[in-house]
Amino acid sequence: MIITFVLAFIIAMSSYGKIKMGSESKPTIGTFRWVAMIMCTLLAGGGVFWSAAEPIFHFITPSPSFSDVKGGTLAAVAPALSQSFLHWGFLAWAVLGTLSTIVLMYAHYNCGVKLRPRALLYPILGDKLENHWIGSVIDACSIIAVAAGTIGPIGFLATQLSYSLTVLTGLESSLMSQIIILTVIVSIYSVSAFSGMDKGLQWLSRMNVIGAVALLVAILVLGPTGFIFKEFGMAFGTYIQHLPEMSLSTADPSWNSWWTWFFWGWFIGFAPMMAIFIARISQGRSIRELIITVAIIAPIATNFWFSSLGGTGIFLELQTPGSISQPLQEAGLPAVLLASLAQLPFSFLLIPAFLVLTTTFVATTGDSMAYSIAMAVEGTDTPSRYQRLFWAVMMGVVAGVLLIAGDGGLNALQSFIVITAVPVSFLVGVTFITGPIAVLRMKSAELESKSSVDCTKSVTV
């Protein structure tokens, strides 16, 4: 993941960053909508669920990288946030949509290859995999991995909403209540997937960003504004300073398997299909625009979001020890968001607003990934609405099965995500080679003033 980020950043800052991707000279989707669709698809419900829960967990129990820091103290704030930044920062975003997207856009728009995961190997294998069974296996593994990565947020949201309803209404949180909530969520994003990218998905993404910004402003106004900005700056500095050692740490395998390896397995599993989705909406964008947006702007925005929600919870815990840690200990991660918001002014408005935002975030991810899977299966940019609907519903069904298998807990969901990402990691790793090759060939085509390039010839530097 470090290599992906470094390579992508070097390409973006070089003269190759000016290369326009796709068959259109100008972007086909406005910048605001483009950024909104990218961010909302990855953040999903995790952007709300984990942004509140993860920092407070690392604050109470510092990660192995900061084992010398005493938990629950002011000194533990920056390390806690910086550990969260690692999981949701530059490296995670880079692996999702930089080199892999460049390769797919080259293969599809320059060489006419179908937009499928197997196309990530096109720069080195040509069309050998187009009709080969190995190509089908690659596509199948990628579909399973992204389905798992999408099912995770759907399941997380079901547990979050079920717990919230228990606290707000007194109704018992049970597996049945989670399944009912899951059914409602799946219905929402299935309708959006059926409506298509130009209607349901773009509308959902736009509303998500507007809602997220509004709620972020509310947190900054009603919460500990100075504390949030101060600790964000300190945590970001700590993150940059300790990035190499945190990302390469293997000090505690059991801890890593629950945190770092889980998150990175999640994002790697997402990568091929996320790249397909970004490639579909990025025609007319330059390589530099893509990389700066995906690997720089999006991670920083995500980190500030984590600082705002997670930092608020940490501040409240510092002011009143036990106010956040006690609900966390008693009810687990889903309790943190509610415990934090309940202590702010106008909590009766903030709590339902955040729950609605979490739901629409997950709906955006379910919608976009159903669209990407349908594209990979049909091999077309505009898959049929029934194909999109089928995959939207199937992801919900599997999420329900995993919730039942895990008795409503998170362990089954997390294990499913990590296991399915293993074979995909090899495919994503190849982009270290195919990414630069694709860039060189697109540059060659640009210099020759061609709309397409001889995709079989070698490129000399």
Predicted regions: what they are:
Residues 3-10, 44-47, 87-159, 167-193, ...:
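Helix-loop-helix module between adjacent transmembrane segments
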Residues 1-76, 194, 217, 431-447, ...:
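N-terminal alpha-helical transmembrane segments of multi-pass membrane transport
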